[in-house]
Amino acid sequence: MNRANFGLIKLVTYIPNVGEQSKRLGALLENSIIDLCSADKSIPNDMRSFLSLNSTDKWSKVINVINNINNRRIPIENCKIKAPIEPGKIICIGLNYKEHANEAKMAIPKEPIVFSKFDNAICGPNDSIIKPVESDEVDYEVELVVVIGKQAKNVSESDALQYVAGYTVGNDVSARDWQLRKNNSQWLLGKTFDTFAPIGPSIVINPEVAALSDDTYFDPNNLSIKCTLNGQVVQNSTTKEFIFNIQTVVSYLSKLFTLNPGDIIFTGTPSGVGFIRKPNPIFLKSGDVIKCEIEELGSLVNNVK
């Protein structure tokens, strides 16, 4: 496989010009985007379709496109960045940081706590999080999101990262009144209102599966993770504090059901969520701006409407 000379691969879904509606698959550089399908017609123009390719040379094709200086770069200011993927399954892990479990006064789980969201919850960078009229207790949760790149069933922890295409930033927005009190405290109902799963801005490709150079390697289980609300830091931790690391989560889930390319996994949030704060809990209101940041993966910014 050809080696990249540019560092990490960051793939985005974008609309190239204001007024257009068709989404495109691109490679994100510092201040520009390369349209992958325009440069190589064999590359699908959709993230999930691309990840579903069985071809072993799909990463080489992307690397070749990015390395070719003759390929047109589109200034990022001329593009609208969308959610990087329209996922298959949206799987979520609850209480996966010890400090978060402690602040919630819940027992440290012995196995991953699993719930889900529906695809109506997905939105992208700079999209508005819509505060539903049915909830007065909407909360934030910065999370690292795993993107599956290869069908996984009964995989071992030692092999699990080979099934991970990459990672992105997510916000597991939660209506605490529905999650914890209303209608028998159903987590699903509290987690899957429209726009309650912002993700982005890009999928940072797992260097192991793309055979990138050693200097691009990063450990997804040891990244700083932070959330700011209106400029004030409300969550600040590291994925080193995972109770169940990414290998454990992927392996565990694959033994329960098949993971397919394009499935995504929210891996849990650190301490600092709004509803637990004493004496004054914090809930999102119209006009708030939330910034979720993860080392190596970038920043995801959304406003509340």
Swiss-Prot record:
The UniProt function text for this chain reads: May have hydrolase activity.
Which cofactor names does the annotation list? Ca(2+); Mg(2+)
| Catalytic activity, EC | 3.-.-.-
Organism of provenance = Dictyostelium discoideum
Q: What is this protein called?
A: Fumarylacetoacetate hydrolase domain-containing protein 2 homolog
As recorded in UniProt, coiled-coil segments are none
Q: Which GO terms describe its molecular function?
A: hydrolase activity; metal ion binding
Binding of a divalent metal cation occurs at E141, E143, D172
Record keyword Metal-binding present: yes
PANTHER family associated with the record: FUMARYLACETOACETATE HYDROLASE DOMAIN-CONTAINING PROTEIN 2A, FUMARYLACETOACETATE HYDROLASE DOMAIN-CONTAINING PROTEIN 2A-RELATED
**Which SUPFAM superfamilies does this UniProt record tie to the protein?**
FAH
Keywords assigned by UniProt, alphabetized: Calcium, Hydrolase, Magnesium, Metal-binding
Q: Which family does it belong to?
A: Belongs to the FAH family.
Magnesium keyword on record? yes
Gene Ontology process terms (BP): small molecule metabolic process
